[in-house]
Structures are given as structure tokens and as C-alpha cells.
């Protein structure tokens, strides 16, 4: 599997390289892995379309299976499909919910109130309990703690994991 990853000259590049070095089945094509706080290649917000232009063009051109784009501090990410299309945070939340529900049947999944119906529909379809919530780290983490949710996602690209004590990663 070939993956192009853009870390926006943030801190994720060196860490991601070490991770991919341990998974020889994955071919990593790095973009902007050298940390540089001036962000010389493009802005750091993956939600801004102008910051995604290059990776959206490169993924299909280089026959990659997937593109991954991180913000500079590494607490948000989004994917680009093999045709170069951006996958919004709520759809990423729905996709990851499927994974968590396979591992934790009937689990609770928290998502932000701005998300489309795709999240709730996916969670229900695969036997989980969807709970929408106020936007923001503190609100999401509290709701996860109160309900025992295994996973949460926001359209901003923040994803939270019970295994990491509700922290976003």
C-alpha cells in the first residue's frame, strides 16, 4: 500500500517516518517531514483547501492508495482518497467508528454536533450507540468519561480514544 503523507513541516514528520520504518508492507512517500515553524510550503490548517492542493494532486498522479495530511502540532489529520478527494472529519469519524465497533460491539461513539448524519447512521448500522456532543476537547472528553465511549471524533479532524484516556491523537 502506497501512502503519501504531508506533515506540513510540523513535528509529526520524524515520528511518522519511524512508525512507517517498522511497517515494511507500507510504502511511505513523505511530504514536508522536516520540522520548520515558519511552515515554508503551505499553511498548517488541513481544512483550508489551498493547503491541500499539492497532496490532492499527487495522490492520483503517483498512484497512491491514500493521502494523509496532518496539522503542524499533529493533533488533527484528514485523508485524501486515491482519486485525490478530501475526506471530511465526520466521514473519517464514521469510518473509524466501524473499526471500533468491530473491536468493541455495542460501544458508544461520541461525535460533534456539526457532523452529518453519516456518523450516527454508521454507528447505528454497526450496533453502536451514537451520542452527539458540544464541540471542543473538554466537552468531548467529559462525555466520553461519563458514558464509557471508546472513540470520539470532531469535524475539525480531532479524534479521541478511550485507550489514550480520552486524549486526541
Across the structure, where does each feature detected by a protein language model lie?
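Phosphate-binding chemistry for phosphorylated carbohydrates and sugar-nucleotides
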Residues: 1-169
Amino acid at each position: 500500500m502506497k501512502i503519501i503523507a504531508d506533515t506540513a513541516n510540523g513535528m509529526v514528520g520524524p515520528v511518522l517516518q519511524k512508525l512507517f520504518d517498522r511497517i515494511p508492507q507500507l510504502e511511505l512517500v513523505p511530504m514536508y517531514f522536516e520540522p520548520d515553524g515558519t511552515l515554508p510550503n503551505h499553511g498548517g490548517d488541513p481544512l483550508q483547501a489551498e493547503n491541500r492542493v499539492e497532496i490532492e494532486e499527487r495522490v492520483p498522479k503517483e498512484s497512491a492508495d491514500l493521502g494523509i495530511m496532518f496539522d503542524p502540532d499533529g493533533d488533527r489529520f484528514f485523508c485524501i482518497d486515491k482519486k485525490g478527494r478530501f475526506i471530511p472529519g465526520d466521514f473519517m469519524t464514521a469510518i473509524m467508528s466501524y473499526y471500533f465497533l468491530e473491536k468493541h460491539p455495542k460501544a458508544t461513539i461520541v461525535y460533534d454536533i456539526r457532523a452529518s448524519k453519516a456518523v450516527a447512521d454508521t454507528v447505528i448500522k454497526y450496533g453502536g450507540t451514537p451520542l452527539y456532543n458540544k464541540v471542543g476537547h473538554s466537552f468531548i472528553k467529559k462525555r466520553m468519561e461519563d458514558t464509557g465511549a471508546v472513540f470520539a471524533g470532531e469535524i475539525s479532524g480531532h479524534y479521541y480514544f478511550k485507550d489514550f484516556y480520552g486524549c486526541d491523537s
